[in-house]
């Protein structure tokens, strides 16, 4: 289950959204919204209110002359006052 969650995305926009209890993660592209919600609720013992997902399109790299694969990004909204604790 840990392999399905790859890492947290930390950009300027995602750091600003932490104030409104929204966390951004890169996850496995085969997961759907209900599976993502169950995984986060089990791992971090929090209540997930909303799950938004988006897939980045394939892009062509001129340096390596091949396509970069797409990835799936998820934005989670959790209850106010709850934090995701990373160990």
Swiss-Prot record:
Biological function: Binds to 23S rRNA.
Cell membrane listed as a keyword: no
UniProt lineage: Eukaryota, Sar, Rhizaria, Cercozoa, Chlorarachniophyceae
Alphabetic keyword roster: Chloroplast, Plastid, Ribonucleoprotein, Ribosomal protein, RNA-binding, rRNA-binding
Matches recorded under SUPFAM superfamilies: Ribosomal proteins S24e, L23 and L15e
Compartments (UniProt record): Plastid, Chloroplast
Name of the molecule in the record: Large ribosomal subunit protein uL23c
Main subcellular location: plastid
Keyword rRNA-binding: yes
